Amino acid sequence: GSSEREIVDLAQGDYEEMDQLAMARPFCKAAYRLTYAQDIGIAVARAIRSAISGRSGGVYLDIPGAMLDAAEGARSLVKVIEPAQRQIPAKSAIDRAIEVMKTAKRPLIVLGKGAAYDQCDDLIRELVEKSGYPFLPMSMAKGLLPDTHPQCAAAARSMVLKDSDVVIMMGARINWLLSHGKGKQWGEPGAKRFVQMDIEAEEMDSNVEIAAPIVGDVGSCCEALLKAMDGAGIAPPKEWLDAVNSKATANMAKMDARLRNNNDPMDYHGALGVIKDAINDHPDTILVNEGANTLDMCRSIVNIHKPRHRIDVGTWGVMGIGMGSAIAAAIETGKRVLAVEGDSAFGFCGMEVETVCRYNLPI
């Protein structure tokens, strides 16, 4: 429990005296403080709704220590009904997106972790395959479709980002992870048109102009687009698909030779080649990954075959969460977890290994 408010507010010197609510607010989606035990149930319900509705995020609930054993709190609990309701996109937004897609000569789909969080995997796969467009998964969207899928353009990432003319962002933000949609990575300025699906309207136009914004949850957006795509004439040109496949095949052949180098001492490529084979042989394994070079190279080398089976440092790039994430994944799923840690990142969380050993977790 947090420190007692009447002592903290007068700075009287309580044990671990700290205004935890004020400290949590800048870093959480929402932060609330309880004053009465009878409000525990409604406060927990509000925290759940805040955490998983709209764009999901962490919520801090400040509960003073005096309330932790209050019997009244248990009696106050409420059932949280539909905490994350669907957000249906406007028909005009879907129609506009189809018109933009019709103009595409070199289309690309970018899958983000928002699409993974939505857990509408079948709809996403249906839309990607029905469109025929090459797709590029961001790191925690890997596995929504297997990295071995014939439409996956991850091995031709530089080419498709630079040369595409219409880019469909599915639950992916155009932030630092994508160079804010600008610079050499994206080719000539103004040469691209973006279709963006996002549950938050404020995300649109955050870095570049969005030609067709679609506000809604990814599942509902996919359903609406799938219906509108029938007979719309949006098939990608064969020349574009052949060029992407040719580049991806050539890059994979070059990389494969480096992964089989068998150097002594072992280098990044040799180590990640072994890990890649292990994941391919055991695709149900959850991969946790953090670091700098370790993160970048592992993301591009190791295939992920199932949704939400890769956990990394996310948008903020915070180091030191890897082993904690591995523990959570093992406990929540019961699956085997493989943690690939950079040396510096492991330095922040290495003592978590003691917890792994104490509970004999499959990590």
Residue ranges and their predicted role:
Residues 9-14, 84-96, 266-267, 290-294, ...:
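A general structural motif
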